[in-house]
């Protein structure tokens, strides 16, 4: 400190001038600017500024010192650091403001705020209910940025260093995605809207209660949720037994069995129909349908094996039928997402349930679902266990209860922070030593951001969402009891996401990560990210995991920021999007089987969240080829999807691929229709199915996808 020099603060008070504060501010800006800490330069600038004022200049103000720092950084050829420093000043200035959301909210109302309106393809920003959620999100985001999240993390988010996901929900102590403990809730009862819901006495009631549970769960969190049919299968037996007991008093046992079977199958059909229609028509407090996944699994030799098989078959049959829009025209459904578990008995090698898998293959060609998970690979990666993803792709890590038993349902994800790997590479400018230095600096920042998420949840009372914390969705805590134990010791997860393995490799090596050289580097980076998560887990006891970010709008945001900062670079920033996680670039010519095999090695590292897909043409007349892909998935990759283009033009009745013109506008190739309300365009967006509404970057990515078969 300089004893003879004071500085005038923003509130007009005086404090002792401390050049170390200038030095530390410059070093922090270097971390998010050039990525390399030039300690000598930071020290020199701080000393130069101190000399200016010691030599008789008027008493410095904070603002004047900041202007001098910026000028000195430019003079010292530290342009990127100067930009980062200026960005930090802007964030700090923003944090001192109030009423900063006027423009963004008015932009929602007059439809000019396209970034927010098109951020999520499953949110229709034209609807009042959705607009209300989006407006609340803008206000919440503003408060979080100014009051809750440290300025340097907000700055890193704004600079595209990282992405603090779901910032619009950060001010509430709610979590991301989860596996609903439906077994507990249906068996032991639950409470919905302060009303006791006892264990169902029939399959139909179980299905109705399940949809009510999902709606309540979805409204109390911001991510996806998943259930397994294993938890509703016992209630199909309950219905059969009820009918059998009724009929055996009047008829022979054989006749009673036949009648009970018929009534059970009728109830099966109506129960599944209830789930489908409820989950497709419900709107949660988030302004959208619940992001729900149903896990279709059959436990061979299990007590309810037959019921599970019946439910699987009926679920797929009804999805194949589709629904109708308000005009009575046939359409597909976005939700629920179906994930079908492939095992020895249904992997199309002569198993007893191959007939269901063949039905699933047919459904793929028309409805894009189900997705496929390999029990063979899951058991290899998760100590012999199988369980569904939480929503789209997020996976839990192993955790055992006090009795040494694995527990999956009733667990959740606390939140996600994603790292922009492309910016790390662009900052390093092909200098490999610098790349690893910058990567480690930014991993430290991601860890800090994830700890902010964790700390915002600490101390939350169970009353915040009784259906989650008190009535079985996750736990059965007492009123007022803190949820803290469920945040620690790996019970729930914290996800480190990542974007742009392909572009990162191009920026550093000038080749795709599918080349031998590129693959080696990409895997090295992936393992480095995983090692970081493992280290954080060891140091904190928290459930850090590596997660392949879906990034529906994020990939466009990162690319836009980097293009402004580094310019247009071939195969890196020359498009409107970056590639999700580790995926092969959408324009790269590669065989379906080769693609799945290549990406499978990334699944084995990214165990906190992974999925792969292949793009195929209309396969309705070539089901054996679809079945071949399904069998390949079982043997080679943990989790994968088959993408077709089952679009419909409502004006002329055309079914097939709705095309994109040069202006990124959808049109019917048969009649030229361009009215979005007169067509349904269904595409796999980021694990979930979206229809008609995407941002420009994602639309361009969709348009450039090549076929893999």
Give the location of each predicted region.
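Charged, amphipathic alpha-helical regulatory modules used
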Residues: 1-108, 703-708
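Short amphipathic alpha-helical segments with coiled-coil-like heptad repeat character
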Residues: 19-23, 77-80, 302-308, 509-513, ...
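Contiguous, well-ordered alpha-helical segments that form the cores/surfaces of helical PPI scaffolds
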Residues: 494-507, 527, 684
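Conserved catalytic cores of very large enzyme subunits
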Residues: 91-95, 101-490, 507, 511, ...
């Amino acid at each position: 400190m300089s004893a003879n020099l004071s500085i005038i603060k923003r509130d007009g008070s005086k404090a002792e001038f401390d050049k170390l504060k200038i030095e530390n501010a410059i070093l922090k800006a270097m971390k998010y600017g050039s990525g390399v800490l030039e300690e000598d330069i930071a020290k020199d600038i701080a000393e130069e500024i101190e000399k200016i004022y010691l030599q008789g200049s008027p008493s410095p103000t904070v603002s004047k010192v900041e202007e001098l720092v910026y000028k000195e950084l430019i003079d010292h050829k530290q342009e990127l650091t100067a930009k980062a420093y200026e960005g930090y000043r802007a964030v700090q200035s923003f944090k001192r403001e109030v009423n900063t959301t006027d423009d963004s909210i008015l932009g929602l109302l007059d439809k000019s705020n396209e970034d927010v309106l098109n951020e999520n393809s499953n949110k229709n920003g034209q609807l009042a209910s959705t607009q209300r959620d989006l407006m609340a999100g803008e206000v919440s985001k503003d408060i979080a940025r100014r009051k809750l999240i440290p300025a340097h993390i907000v700055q890193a988010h704004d600079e595209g260093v990282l992405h603090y996901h779901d910032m619009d929900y950060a001010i509430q102590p709610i979590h991301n995605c989860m596996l609903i403990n439906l077994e507990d809730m249906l068996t032991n009862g639950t409470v919905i809207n302060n009303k006791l819901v006892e264990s169902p006495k029939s399959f139909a009631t179980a299905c109705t209660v399940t949809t009510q549970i999902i709606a309540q769960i979805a409204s109390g969190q911001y991510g996806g949720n998943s259930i397994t049919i294993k938890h509703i299968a016992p209630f199909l037996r309950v219905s059969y037994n009820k009918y059998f007991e009724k009929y055996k008093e009047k008829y022979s046992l054989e006749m009673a069995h036949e009648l009970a079977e018929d009534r059970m199958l009728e109830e099966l059909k109506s129960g599944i129909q209830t789930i489908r229609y409820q989950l497709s028509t419900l709107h949660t407090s988030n302004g959208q349908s619940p992001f729900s996944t149903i896990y279709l699994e059959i436990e061979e030799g299990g007590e309810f094996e037959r019921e599970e098989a019946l439910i699987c078959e009926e679920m797929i049959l009804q999805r194949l039928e589709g629904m109708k829009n308000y005009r009575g025209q046939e359409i597909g459904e976005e939700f629920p997402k179906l994930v079908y578990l492939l095992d020895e008995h249904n992997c199309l090698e002569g198993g007893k349930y191959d007939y269901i898998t063949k039905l699933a293959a047919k459904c793929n060609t028309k409805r894009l679902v189900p997705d496929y998970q390999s029990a063979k690979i899951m058991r290899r990666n998760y100590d012999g266990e199988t369980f569904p993803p939480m929503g789209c792709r997020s996976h839990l890590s192993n955790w055992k209860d006090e009795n040494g038993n694995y527990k999956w349902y009733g667990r959740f994800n606390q939140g996600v922070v994603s790292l922009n790997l492309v910016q790390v590479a662009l900052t390093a400018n092909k200098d490999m030593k610098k790349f690893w230095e910058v990567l480690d600096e930014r991993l430290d920042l991601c860890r800090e951001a994830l700890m902010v998420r964790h700390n915002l949840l600490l101390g939350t009372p169970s009353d915040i969402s009784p259906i989650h914390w008190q009535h079985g969705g996750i736990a059965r805590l007492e009123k007022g009891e803190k949820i803290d134990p469920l945040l620690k010791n790996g019970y729930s997860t914290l996800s480190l996401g990542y974007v742009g393995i392909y572009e990162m490799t191009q920026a550093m090596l000038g080749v795709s990560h599918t080349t031998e050289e590129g693959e080696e580097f990409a895997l090295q980076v992936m393992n480095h990210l995983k090692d970081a998560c493992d280290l954080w887990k060891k140091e904190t006891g928290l459930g850090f995991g590596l997660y392949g970010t879906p990034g529906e709008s994020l990939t466009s945001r990162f690319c836009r920021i980097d293009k402004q900062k580094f310019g247009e670079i071939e195969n890196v920033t020359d498009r409107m999007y970056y590639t999700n996680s580790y995926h092969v670039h959408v324009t790269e010519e590669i065989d379906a089987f080769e693609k799945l095999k290549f990406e499978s090695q990334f699944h084995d590292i990214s165990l906190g969240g992974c999925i792969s897909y292949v793009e195929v043409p209309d396969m309705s007349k070539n089901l054996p080829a679809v079945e071949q892909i399904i069998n390949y998935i079982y043997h080679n990759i943990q989790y994968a999807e088959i993408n077709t283009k089952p679009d419909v033009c409502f004006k002329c009745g055309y079914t097939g691929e709705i095309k994109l013109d040069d202006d990124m506008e959808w049109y019917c190739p048969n009649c030229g229709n361009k009215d979005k309300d007169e067509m349904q365009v269904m595409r796999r967006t980021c694990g979930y199915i979206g229809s008609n509404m995407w941002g420009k970057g994602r639309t361009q990515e969709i348009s450039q996808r090549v076929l893999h078969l």
